[in-house]
Amino acid sequence: EVEGLSMLEPYGAGNPKPVFSLSGVTVTCMSDVGGGRHLKMRASRDGRTVDMIFFSMTRAKSGLNVGDRADVAFYPQINDYRGSRTVQLHLVDLRPSYTAQQVSEQALYRKFARGEAISPYEARQMIPQREEFAAVWRYLASHSGDVTEIPVSLARKIAKENDLWESTLRTMVCLEVLESFGLMTIQKGEGGTLHIRLRKRREGGKLAFYQSPIIQRLQTIAWGEGG
């Protein structure tokens, strides 16, 4: 099937190379190659695995990690190595693949961050439990206090390691509150990545998370002034 595409050659301005897409592939392996200038990865979907290469892209710039779901645009090519012919996808675009819920959660967080009105129900969905704050802190501390992730990937990993319900929305609120306490810095990078760096370790006692202006604002929206 891939070889049949050669019938469309020669490519050019009047006959561009055909580009295809796949949605919701799961990244199973990824590494930088070519002196760290290009990204080589392997992904699977529906029980099938395929190799991919993306020139002038790196793992860090992609914003993805092993286990993440992605959408890819590509043109296929055949590698012939020592008599073995395999299909490899030459990527031209790569981005995280989000579920409808993840898209909705990120939209709600951005809405709140812009200071726009949200409903009491939405506010209640955004307020983290104390164990969620602790889980976020433990994850960051266990990774040397220096993490670069897309929010969805970060939320998934934190939930998995701590046996919690995954919520990109509340993970983002936790990060914002912790940053407001001066415990970390957060820089936004390419592909929606967050570069998070802890500034200092907690030293005994419990942080008053619910005294944070961010949480108090959410509580007021959720339950009123006496909430």
Where are these regions (language model features)?
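Acidic, two-metal ion nucleic-acid-processing modules in DNA metabolism proteins
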Residues: 1-227
